[in-house]
C-alpha cells in the first residue's frame, strides 16, 4: 500500500515541500533563514492576534489600551514585547536572507527573487504601520513624516497624502485604517510566501558553489528538518533573551510619551531596521529626489539579475566581488548608524558619501569587478 503522505492531496503538498523534497547536500546555515522567517511570521500573527483582542484603534484610547495590555492582561507584557522584538528578529532574518541571496547569486531565480522583493516591501509597510499603533510620540511623528513624503509626488502629491490620512493631519481615521491594514497584510505576506516557495520548488534550491546540484541531492527530512530545528532554537533563544532581559533595547523612549501634535520630538527617527533607508532619504537635499532614492534603495534589488555580469553564479570563487560585497555590508552598517544621528556636521557628509557608495557599489563597481574576474579566468 502506498504511503498516505504520497497520495492524499493535502499531505502530498506537504510531503513534496518539507519531507521528500530533493535538496542540495551542501547548503550551509545561510539557507536556514527561510524557515526562520516562516517561524517569525507565525509568531507575529499569533502574538498580533492576541494583542488585537485588547487593543483599541482610537486616538483617545490607543495609548491607554497598550498600557492596559502591559499592566493588566495576563502575560500581556510578554505578548507585547514578543511582538515588538519579534519584528526586529524578523528583519534581522530578512536582511541575512537577502544578503545570502546576493552573495550566492540566488537572484538568478527571477520569479522567486521578484516575489521576495515584493515580500520585503510588504513586510516594511506592515512594520511601519504597526509602529504607528501604540500612538506614542514617535508613532505619531513617524507617521506624519513618512506619509508626508508622498506629497513630493508632482501634481497629485498633496491630495494623495490627505486621502491616506483621511483628513488634514494624522488623526483618528489614519490610526483606524493603519490598524486594519496592519492586521490584513501579514496574511497577504503568508500567501506571497507560499508563492515564493512554489516558484523556488520549480527550480530547486541554489547552493554555496552556485553549480548545479542535480547529481547530489538528499531528502529534506530528516537532514534539513533537524538543521532547521537547531536554527529555530537559536532564534527562540535570541528572542527570549531580548524580550526577558532588555525588551526596550531597540525601541525609542519617546514612544512612552503619548502622541502630542503640538510638540515635535527633537529627533524623529524610525525603528533601527529602517535607518539605512532613512539615511539615504536624508542625504539628498531635494524632497522628491530623496523619496526616489529611498524607494530605489530597495527596488535596486530587483535589478540584481540584470547587473550580474559574471560567468559564475556564486561569489564563492570570486575574491574581488567578495571584497566589494563586504564593503557593501559595512556601508549598510554605516548608513544605519547615520540614520540614527542628528542632521549636523559631520554626519551629513558621512551619510551622503555612504549613500553614493551604496549605489556605486551595486550599479557600477560590482558589475565591473565581475567583468575583471571573467578576464582573470582566461589569464
Swiss-Prot record:
Function comment: Component of the ubiquinol-cytochrome c reductase complex (complex III or cytochrome b-c1 complex) that is part of the mitochondrial respiratory chain. The b-c1 complex mediates electron transfer from ubiquinol to cytochrome c. Contributes to the generation of a proton gradient across the mitochondrial membrane that is then used for ATP synthesis.
Family label: Belongs to the cytochrome b family.
GO molecular function: metal ion binding; ubiquinol-cytochrome-c reductase activity
Membrane topology listed for this record: Multi-pass membrane protein
Subcellular location: Mitochondrion inner membrane
UniProt keyword Translocase present: no
Species in which this protein is naturally found: Mogera wogura
Residues that coordinate or bind a ubiquinone: 201
Lineage summary: Eukaryota, Metazoa, Chordata, Craniata, Vertebrata
Cofactor names: heme b
Gene3D superfamilies recorded: Cytochrome Bc1 Complex, Chain C
Cofactor comment text: Binds 2 heme b groups non-covalently.
Organism domain of life: Eukaryota
Positions with a binding annotation for heme b b562: 83, 182
Pfam families given in the database record: Cytochrom_B_C (PF00032), Cytochrome_B (PF00033)
UniProt keyword terms in alphabetical order: Electron transport, Heme, Iron, Membrane, Metal-binding, Mitochondrion, Mitochondrion inner membrane, Respiratory chain, Transmembrane, Transmembrane helix, Transport, Ubiquinone
Main location per the UniProt record: mitochondrion
Additional detail: Heme 1 (or BL or b562) is low-potential and absorbs at about 562 nm, and heme 2 (or BH or b566) is high-potential and absorbs at about 566 nm.
Ranges that cross the membrane: 33-53, 77-98, 113-133, 178-198, 226-246, 288-308, 320-340, 347-367
Residues that, per the record, bind heme b b566: 97, 196
Cellular component GO terms held in the UniProt record: mitochondrial inner membrane; respiratory chain complex III
Protein name listed in UniProt: Cytochrome b
Biological process terms in GO annotation: mitochondrial electron transport, ubiquinol to cytochrome c
Subunit structure: The cytochrome bc1 complex contains 11 subunits: 3 respiratory subunits (MT-CYB, CYC1 and UQCRFS1), 2 core proteins (UQCRC1 and UQCRC2) and 6 low-molecular weight proteins (UQCRH/QCR6, UQCRB/QCR7, UQCRQ/QCR8, UQCR10/QCR9, UQCR11/QCR10 and a cleavage product of UQCRFS1). This cytochrome bc1 complex then forms a dimer.
InterPro entries listed in its UniProt record: Cyt_b/b6_C (IPR005798), Cyt_b/b6_C_sf (IPR036150), Cyt_b/b6_N (IPR005797), Cytb/b6-like_sf (IPR027387), Cytochrome_b (IPR030689), Cytochrome_b_C_euk/bac (IPR048260), Cytochrome_b_N_euk/bac (IPR048259), Di-haem_cyt_TM (IPR016174)
